[in-house]
């Protein structure tokens, strides 16, 4: 019996920093990061090229309480450094699972991580390595969602997979409204008109303009990542 082929050859996975916390209130939960890496490894074994953009909200958020009274640009740089810490942890967990991971940072920290160079990133992906993009876009005032849209467009990803704690986009908050229903798919224009808050406007506009679809799915739901990559009805597809 022949196995179904993956629906995508090259993907950009956007992981929030909060996703690494698991049930903890702060930081990186070891069991959670190991489970995530196992799911990523399963997808790479299908021959899919995986790049990751990771957030830093489990350590520091430039727009959150810890940054009150702080210069916004300074706070954003601190948030970028938090993403580097997360990227190193993720790469370490991947290397222990027999994956080969490369961290590429938008901010130069040469003793610790490689600088982001697009041709090198593409080479790593072609070689079957997982590339983890750290430090967002390298600029303050831009979110890691925008970094995911930017890197996704740069590397020619077929889709941005936004991993969240909810299994898609709903008509309302499913935890507050029991009648809320999940969208199977909707257009960028519909999502923007309904103000569904899937990504910030800059990230969303970039994906729309580059005709780069976004699929929102739950990273907590076991096997969801693989189902998304296989093109199954999982999460919510936002298309042009």
Curated annotation (Swiss-Prot):
Activity control mechanisms: Inhibited by UTP.
Binding residues annotated for ATP, in chain numbering: 14-17, 57, 61, 164, 170, 173
Gene Ontology MF annotations: ATP binding; UMP kinase activity
Cell compartments where the protein resides: Cytoplasm
CC terms in the record's Gene Ontology section: cytosol
Top EC class of this enzyme: transferase
Catalytically driven reaction(s): UMP + ATP = UDP + ADP
E.C. number(s) listed in UniProt: 2.7.4.22
The protein's role, per its UniProt record: Catalyzes the reversible phosphorylation of UMP to UDP.
UniProt similarity note: Belongs to the UMP kinase family.
HAMAP family: PyrH_B
Name this protein carries in UniProt: Uridylate kinase
UniProt source species: Verminephrobacter eiseniae (strain EF01-2)
Organism phylogeny: Bacteria, Pseudomonadati, Pseudomonadota, Betaproteobacteria, Burkholderiales
Gene of this entry: pyrH
